[in-house]
Each structure stands twice: as structure tokens, then as C-alpha cells.
């Protein structure tokens, strides 16, 4: 069913424009570009993220300072991020200034020039960013997990890229990657606020004038998840683990995805939920424990991350498997209703944010998914039964004695060893 508040228009050159008319005092406008880690060769690894930094560093008519001042003098904000499957450049402004937001995005997406001095400056910034994440225990744990769970797949690598790549990227590398992926048919402009769709489309059409360029899309390997056990030592003082297994994908049905969300909430929807109660409250095995889920176009995973003492790892891993498999049966009516209420509340909070709505619409348009109203989604949530949850649990979660998990463990470095792992 069509969401009456969301309108979609595909322009003649392939650019897609999505608007959601909603009663906010500000407007959020973003460009969703279908390129990220997954599109990069090994030699290009890190280019999507580097390019995300560079689009703010000068265009044919504006310097980096002029670009930021163009939005900030209006009280607005601009930012960007890179993920596995997309790069997003966005701005948020007061309602009356929405045309300035379109002008800004059109300029940085079409006219970035990548000055040499800015490349060198951002190269140093990204090197510091890499070092920062390498010194963050949770980031390093997640990176180690992805390296093993998706070994051999592009998504096993870091979005930031390796230092040797960052140190060698040239202006031509940035230009070539920019010209390859920042093309009309590969971009969605998504906006939310008090917006007239037709007026917005006409202004976007006039602002984005570049023609069609052929784009070669990367197809993700389906079900590239691997059941591997890996362990390494590191400089951090506390041990961690992530165990995970194949999860739902972005292309699965809305009902399956929502049932999966409810399942995840039953497991870890707060301090009274199963995972926290079993691992921390009942057994005291971990200071921090949480369910982790990640959904991609053709891949996904669900698992448990914990920070704990090394002596508790084996017991905590087994208990985590027990908790995960526990949702295959014996879900109480109270648990199910609590999860439904929690998921609905979270959904309601997103509908109170123009940035959340524009983001959801941008992703849905980029990957060809349907749009749903809040009421349609709420109706779906409360229609889900315990049997629906059991079916999804049995489809994705192995039995508690199964080895169908990727198990990754990080422990403090043993200083008695002569050499680090």
C-alpha cells in the first residue's frame, strides 16, 4: 500500500527524488549515493570514505570555508557518512531555507574539485581516525568479527581502508571514483518537512543538471557468512567476544523483518529482557552484554557481544547460545506484547524526526523497497503471533549445541610472550 505522505519521482536522467510532507519547523535533505565499502576493489578500499570527506573541501565556485558558511549562516548543519552499501551527504535547515540545502547538495555532488592541499590535510585526518578506532576496544572487536565472518568478501574490510591505501590515494583516484559512482541514476535525493513535492522536484531538476553516465554496479555475494572460530590478543585490558550467525536481509518481506525485530527485542529490549538477565544479572559473567544485528541487501547477522573477564568467556558464550535459541519456544504473552509495544514506541520516535523519516525513505528508494505509513507498520507489528516469532527463530538461530556460529574472541596481551599476535 502506498504511503500517501511520501511521493517519489524519477527524473529524466535517472535521479530519484523522494519527499515526505510532515509538519516540522525544519527540513532535512540528503543525497543517498549507492556506493560504499562493498563497491571498492582492494586497491580502492577506503576511497568511498575518503571521498565523503573531500566533497566538503571545495567546489568550482566555493572553498571549503564558503561551503560550510553557506549552510551555517542560515542556522543549518551539514554532514556525511559512509557505510557498507551507501554514502550519504545531508543537510538540515529551517523550513524557509530548503532551496539553499538543495543548492548545497547539488554543488558538492556535481562540482567538487578535490584540491591537492585539502587532500593532504584530509589524509592526515583520516589516518588519525583510523588510529582512533584501532584504540577503541568495541570498534576493534567488531572489525575482527567482520574480518572472520565474511572472510574473502568485500564487507570483511574496514570502511576506513588500510593506512597504505590512504597514504597513496591521488587526486585522480578520487576524481575517477567520483565520476564512476556519483551519477544521477545512482543517487536518491530524499527530503522531509513542509515540502511541496512538485515544487521540490522542479528545483532539484534545475539544480542537478549533469547528464547520464554509465555505472557498473557490484553485486554482493549472497549468504557469504562463514562459521569460523578466531581468537587474538590485543593491547586492551578487558576481554571481549562476538558470536554471530546469519540473519535476515534487507530484501526479505516486511513481515519477516518486523518479526525478526520483535524477536531481537524479546532477547535484548532492556534490562528486564532475556540476554541481560541471564548473562549479567543471574550469572554475573559480563559487565556489558548486548544483542547485535546488522541487515544488508543480501547479507545479515544476529549475535551477541560481551565485555568480560577472560575466565568467563566459555561459559558466557554457551549461555549466549542458550539465550538465543530460547526464543524458538516458550515466549510468554507478556513478553510478546512488551516487545510489540517497545518496537512501536521506537517506530513512533522515528516518525517524530524529519531526519529519521528522510533517512528511511532514502534507503528504501535507493534499494527499491516499499514505503509504509506508521499505521500500516503498527498494524503489522500487532498482527505478529508467537508462531511467527518461532518460525523466524528456527530459520535463523542455530540450536544451543550447534557450531553454526562465527565465534571471535579478543583477550588482553600476555606480556610473558615475546611476540604479539
Where are these regions (language model features)?
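His/Glu-based metal-binding/catalytic segments typifying zinc-dependent metallopeptidases
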Residues: 21-25, 30-32, 214-273
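Solvent-exposed coil/turn segments that connect beta secondary-structure elements
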Residues: 22, 34-36, 59-60, 94, ...
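Phosphate-proximal small/polar/acidic motifs at interfaces that engage nucleotide phosphates
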Residues: 276-277
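Charge-rich, well-structured scaffold segments of protease-associated domains
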Residues: 10, 64-216, 231, 241, ...
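Active-site SXXK
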Residues: 46-59
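Short pre-active-site segment immediately N-terminal to the catalytic Zn-binding motif
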Residues: 35-44
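N- or domain-start disorder-to-order transition segments that initiate the globular core
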Residues: 1-27
Amino acid at each position: 500500500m502506498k504511503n500517501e505522505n511520501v511521493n517519489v519521482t524519477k527524473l529524466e536522467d535517472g535521479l530519484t527524488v523522494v519527499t515526505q510532507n510532515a509538519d516540522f519547523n525544519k527540513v532535512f535533505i540528503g543525497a543517498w549515493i549507492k556506493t560504499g565499502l562493498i563497491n571498492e576493489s582492494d586497491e580502492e578500499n577506503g576511497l568511498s570514505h575518503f571521498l565523503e570527506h573531500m566533497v566538503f573541501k571545495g567546489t568550482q565556485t566555493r572553498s571549503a570555508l564558503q561551503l560550510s558558511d553557506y549552510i551555517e549562516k542560515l542556522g543549518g548543519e551539514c554532514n556525511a557518512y559512509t557505510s557498507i552499501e551507501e554514502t550519504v551527504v545531508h543537510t538540515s535547515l529551517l523550513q524557509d531555507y530548503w532551496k539553499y540545502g538543495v543548492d548545497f547538495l547539488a554543488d558538492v555532488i556535481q562540482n567538487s574539485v578535490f584540491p591537492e592541499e585539502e587532500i593532504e590535510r584530509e589524509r592526515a585526518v583520516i589516518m588519525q581516525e583510523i588510529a582512533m578506532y584501532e584504540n577503541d576496544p568495541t570498534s576493534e572487536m567488531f572489525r575482527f568479527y567482520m574480518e572472520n565472518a565474511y572472510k574473502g568478501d568485500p564487507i570483511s574490510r574496514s570502511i576506513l581502508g588500510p593506512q597504505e591505501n590512504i597514504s597513496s590515494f591521488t587526486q585522480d583516484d578520487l576524481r575517477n571514483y567520483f565520476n564512476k559512482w556519483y551519477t544521477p541514476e545512482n543517487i536518491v535525493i530524499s527530503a522531509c518537512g513542509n515540502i511541496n513535492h512538485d515544487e521540490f522536484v522542479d528545483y532539484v531538476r534545475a539544480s542537478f543538471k549533469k547528464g547520464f553516465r554509465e555505472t557498473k554496479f557490484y553485486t554482493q555475494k549472497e549468504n557469504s557468512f562463514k562459521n569460523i572460530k578466531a581468537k587474538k590478543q590485543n593491547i586492551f585490558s578487558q576481554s571481549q567476544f562476538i558470536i554471530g550467525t546469519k540473519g535476515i536481509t534487507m530484501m526479505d518481506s516486511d513481515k519477516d523483518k518486523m518479526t525478526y525485530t520483535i524477536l531481537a527485542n524479546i532477547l535484548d529490549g532492556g534490562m528486564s529482557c532475556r540476554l541481560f538477565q541471564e548473562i549479567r544479572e543471574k550469572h554475573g559473567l559480563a559487565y556489558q552484554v548486548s544483542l547485535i544485528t546488522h541487515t544488508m541487501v543480501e547479507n545479515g547477522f544476529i549475535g551477541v557481544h560481551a565485555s568480560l573477564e577472560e575466565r568467563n568467556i566459555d561459559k558466557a558464550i554457551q549461555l549466549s547460545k542458550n539465550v538465543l535459541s530460547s526464543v524458538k519456544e516458550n515466549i510468554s504473552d507478556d513478553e510478546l506484547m512488551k516487545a510489540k509495544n517497545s518496537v512501536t514506541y521506537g517506530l513512533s520516535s522515528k516518525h517524530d524526526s524529519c531526519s529519521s523519516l528522510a533517512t528511511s525513505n532514502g534507503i528504501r528508494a535507493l534499494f527499491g523497497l516499499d514505503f509504509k505509513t506508521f499505521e500500516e507498520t503498527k498494524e503489522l507489528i500487532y498482527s505478529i503471533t508467537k508462531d511467527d516469532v518461532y518460525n523466524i527463530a528456527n530459520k535463523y538461530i542455530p540450536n544451543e549445541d550447534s557450531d553454526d556460529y562465527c565465534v571471535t574472541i579478543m583477550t588482553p596481551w600476555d606480556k610473558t610472550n615475546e611476540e604479539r599476535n
